[in-house]
Amino acid sequence: MKEELFKEKSRYITGFVLIIVAGLILYADNLLLFWAVLGGVYAVGFSEALRLFQVKASFSLYLILVLSWVAAYFNGHPIECALISAMVMASIIAYQKEHHSEAILPFLYPGVGFFALFGVYKDFGAVAIIWLLVVVVASDVGAFFGGKLLGKTPFTPTSPNKTLEGALIGVVLASVLGSFVGMGKLSGGFFMALLFSFLTALMAVFGDLYESYLKRKAGIKDSGKILPGHGGVLDRLDSMLFGALSLHVLLYFLEVWKETAVFLGD
């Protein structure tokens, strides 16, 4: 009983600290600061992914991680750096027999998600990150309490504790709340922000499920222990990483569509 109370207390304290830190970083609104902090988080998440995929850590893995993250700071399209890092790792696997084929996986997850998260900030600013946070947090909170109150139907064998009703409530709540934040970012207004929030929330749900699947497959409860009461970095950011990729793609193609419309109009 005492252990459960201590864990619950640790969970709230850690959550409060994370909110304060995230708030200060977004308030500072400095690209270098955001890149540096997120890079450190990525390194921890990458180490956790090595454990999930049962890949042995090596110098070459972390060298590619560091070089690709540095390149992302200077590259106009950070996600490209994630894909290139995966291609470089695949080339090393093909050339040498030092690594198993699974060594490419951490560069895809969580790699692509972290680069997408950096891309959301770099390309679309702090408001887009706040939008993403609102969507993901609302989805998680709505799913938890919705499942507790109304949940009856199991959502998936991957995560037996989650219910279909909870997931739906979470997505609806995230879509509505997210749209109020996102509409200030989009010229299309409320309904386009609602659509983008819905698609991002949907991807966030599957990010959480994928992390649950990996942990179940690896036979572990948490991806790490760095966050008291929460587990590892990936335990906290699984939904965020999938949601970031979704939101970045949506916002990017919206920008391309606008530029194309202007070009054709001229």
Question: What would you call each of these model-derived segments?
Answer:
Residues 19, 174-175, 236, 243, ...:
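Hydrophobic transmembrane alpha-helices of multi-pass small-molecule transporters
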Residues 2-163, 167-199:
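Membrane-embedded alpha-helical bundles of polytopic integral membrane proteins
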Residues 43-53, 136-152, 164-165, 202-244:
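Acidic (Asp/Glu-rich) catalytic motifs at the cytosolic membrane interface
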Residues 23, 60, 152, 220-223, ...:
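Hydrophobic alpha-helical membrane context
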Residues 251-266:
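Juxtamembrane boundary at the C-terminal end of a transmembrane helix
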